[in-house]
Amino acid sequence: MNINNNVILLKSNHIRGVLPLTREKFNEILHSESYIIWKIKDFDTHELADTPVKSPDAQLVELKNSDLHGAYLSAHFDAGIWPVVYQGENNGHLIRHVCPLKTAEGKISSQGGKFDFYPHVDNPDLKITGEDSISNIGNCPDTLTLLCLRAEPGVNTSLLQLDKVIEVLPEDVVQTLSKPLYRVKRPDSFEGSLSVEMVPVLVKSNDTWYSRFDWHNINGLSAEAEMALEKMRAVTLDKNLWLDIPLHPGEAVTFLNQRTLHTRNSFNPRYDGTDRWLLRIFGLMNRPPISHLLEPHVCLHHLRTFL
């Protein structure tokens, strides 16, 4: 197990009452709106380190801020959400620092800043709800939580509710997007450049739509498929559909990853310790099966993403 994960998981076991509302109320709001904004208890900005500017800084910060990170994980357990990390991403750390790092300066990723991060679902190359799971590969995360440590004026995470996007699309476009006519590239935050083919963008399960849409990493395998995808891309850039989430330090947003799209506008990082800084956690609504774990004897949160 990643040593920092071990430290914060142990601390999370001894921290209670971080979530400011009951599990039932949290999930009622989350599943009705597809997102919920909440505030972590006893958050103190004066205890924060500088915003990391390179990966080793982030690892040191995790140990320095281990109480905060343990409380953050504890809130997920209180909400009935199982925190996970994926093989090949974030060096195995459960918590990702969403801040501009110099090593990611030229990338469109959560650790970049200079480029707009257009609407997307995280980890879209993995199986989504309504698809048959692969026996020994983890599924796409159900939830994504962002906790704000340091805000940047004018820079927001924005959400689009999937149902409102689908309402705007013509029926024939939705039908095409529901066919296995697409190639999905694994996002830049992962090591390597794997992709999957012959998958749909949209899946309907139990009368509910789920999505793996990613503005940057999906393309159609036919002219018809690409045309439908272009129409969805255009709709997702309609800012009338965007819900701006201007988080303040200590506030968090948890959203349903496959029932929303999220985006972030570009900004110019200063790399001086004062840049925008959030902490990201992926979650599953159910504990993953042992077969999905990379090393089940070592860690119950690290999911396999390739054979």
Where are these regions (language model features)?
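N-terminal non-catalytic cap/leader segment that marks the start of a structured domain
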Residues: M1-L101
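Active-site environment of non-heme Fe oxygenases that use a 2-His-1-carboxylate facial triad
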Residues: M1-L21, S34-W38, D44-L48, H97-P249, ...
